[in-house]
Amino acid sequence: NPWQHKIQYKKTWLEMDTLFKDNSGFEASYHFNINPNLDATAMQSIRAVVERPELWKVFINGNEVSKTEGSFWIEKSFPQFSVGEFLKPGKNTLTIKALRMHILAEVMPVYLLGDFSVVPNDKGFEIAGGNIDTLGSWKENGLPFYSQKVAYSQNFNISGLENMAYKVKLPNWKGTVAEVFVNGQPAGLIAWQPNELDITSSLKEGENEITAKVTGSLKNTFGFFYQNNDNWIFGPHSWNYAPEKAPSGSEYFLMEYGLMEPFELVAVKL
């Protein structure tokens, strides 16, 4: 990777692209397994994300696919490719081919998106059916790489708002921020100690639905995965290490995210 440790002066590195001949291309293949318990609808939903699509031809199980115009993941450098129609239970292969080597043609991760979970196997993870349906770590619920939001809802019956204050408290959660909604309306954020939010003004007499949406981060999406996460700073050097053989997904270093215990509604008499 010439971009990790080099400094571009004018066009010094970009001009090296002229050194590559027309027949200097290469290909890289990514193999993954799909568990038979993944239903057809979920399999059809799967999309692949390949960076810099202008440099590659993309194939899934030997079938060439094109990016979906206007469909991006995270930002415009991450276009999506609909690949679900060419997938099957068992082993699948996504291949990128460069007809000519290019100075920007780095072999980077390819991402798979869709309505599925993953389970550890001997080498990494296997795509499977299922979704989060309980409290606890996203890692243990089949979404170890998920970075977005999971909503947790509870109903509370309120009798007597006068001279009372009500706070939502998250006693045990892992995430970057939690959004709180009362009866479908935003009530505020929880992001630091004491992990509580006054929602008195959002409540009504009787039944109230309270939802906490916990947000993860891109750390578990982009990695790194093969060494401990305890360092206080991360940089390009953090990706320099990889084991000799692909480890089981159960050995990946991943951060905990999720709501570990039910949130509480604390009533305080004024």
Features from the language model and the residues they span:
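Active-site-adjacent substrate/metal-binding segments within catalytic domains
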Residues: 20, 29-31, 150-153, 166-168, ...
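Solvent-exposed beta-strand/loop surfaces of large extracellular or lumenal domains
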Residues: 53, 58-80, 179-197
